[in-house]
Amino acid sequence: LIDKVLGIGEVALSDHRSSQPTKDEMKRIATQARLGGMLSGKAGVLQLHMGSGKSGLSMIFEILDETEVPARHFIPTHVNRCPKLLRQAKELARRGGYMDITSGGRLCDGFTGGVEPHEAIRQCYEEGVPMDHVTMSSDGNGGMSVPQPDGTVKLLTARLHSLHEELRQAVLDGVPLEVAV
């Protein structure tokens, strides 16, 4: 673990696997992460496992508008799962929050409906999203579900080497190496 970070996570939002926390519960959790960070001299973050549900990050934006918790305490993951979620994550990063792109959910690996990781990085760079608020992780060998047309769910594995491949492709797409890394 990183000694400069204290936090809570991953809390699932907008996902069929979520326990569907209420906005008040999320306000309390975010405040606890923030206060824990303040008391310990660490970041105090709330990491969010994001699904592709229709609400996306809307609850987080409501919390930011209704409380004194700064955006920097929120880190949604899997934000390239669908285009709408990626757009919301870019807005969160512009407001001072962070966003984590998943390299392990690529079309070539059987995932559909998402934004290719290298494409998400390129979009962020070209649209002026603060790149020091954008991270990418592989979700290393994590199980990822892909809904099927018949209502079943196919399980796939996020491959570790996808991180290197996607960073390489982002550079080939025009993102400067020092920005991509």
Residue ranges and their predicted role:
Residues I2-I101, F111-T135:
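Histidine/acidic residue-rich metal-binding segments in metalloenzymes
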Residues R81-P83, G105-C108, N141-M144:
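Short, catalytically relevant binding-site loops at active-site mouths
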Residues K90-T112, K154-V175:
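Extended low-complexity acidic/polar segments
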Residues E126-V181:
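His/Asp/Glu-enriched, well-ordered alpha-helical/loop segment
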